[in-house]
């Protein structure tokens, strides 16, 4: 599994529908794409949400990102991530 960080931004309409049920819906979309949420945070500022998610690969991360936008009205910027230790091994 590969780790991805998903940065979410609510649309005006999506803010009106925030609920624990929608959080469960988002988790289900990620699971349906083969992913697993490792951590989720609500933020203040330009980014409203950050999710740390494991997916089998880029295709599944992209699939979940698009489906989340379609279902919830939250746009995501999704980036692959590696630990600092993995990064050091890659560049060292």
Where are these regions (language model features)?
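Short S/T/G/P-rich N-terminal loop/turn motif that feeds into the first structured element of a domain
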Residues: 1-32, 36, 44-47, 84-92
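Short, well-ordered beta-strand segments in beta-rich or mixed alpha/beta enzyme
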Residues: 5-9, 41-64
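Short, flexible active-site loop motifs that bind/organize anionic cofactors or intermediates
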Residues: 13, 51, 77
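Generic structural signal for residues in well-ordered beta-strands
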Residues: 37-40, 76-78
